[in-house]
Amino acid sequence: SDETEAVDLQGGVCIVEGIHALNPEVTGYDGRTTRIYVSVRTRITPRSGHPLHPSKIRLVRRMLRDSTGRGRALSETIAMRERVDRGEQRYIMPFKPRAHGSIDSFYSAELGVYRPLLRDELERLALPELSDVLEVMRELPDVPADLVPQDSLLREFIGGSTLPY
């Protein structure tokens, strides 16, 4: 959007959240700004020894969020992956070096939470590009979603959050 809005912080703090928040066109060029990149960084290694790339965990998150929040079929989200990846390379990654620090947003139990929500459908789709995701999920126990706090980041993907999105 071309809309801009000036905010007078009066000495306070403003937190801008989102995938485009590192872009200086969004947050400005002010040298006083502290920028933090938040994304999955963890690589899960199944028994086969082939690590699951963080981009696959981000895809799983997108599939769940699109399904629960947007009513989109998993196959639709998977079909959009190439376009989403191109956008990430063009609009997000160039600004990643502007971050003063980074936070790994991976939760150790998250794939176990996603497993009962996704595994059967992923098995049915049998897509070669997701075979590594299935391999990891097959090795994990189910983690009931009701164990995830309602204000957890994971709720953005599985639904049931008390926070507005």
Residue map of PLM features:
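ATP-dependent small-molecule kinase phosphotransfer cores
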Residues: 1-14, 72-81
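Structural recognition of the conserved hydrophobic beta-strand(s) that form the central parallel beta-sheet
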Residues: 13-18, 37
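Conserved NTP phosphate-binding and transfer environment spanning the P-loop NTPase/kinase superfamily
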Residues: 21-165
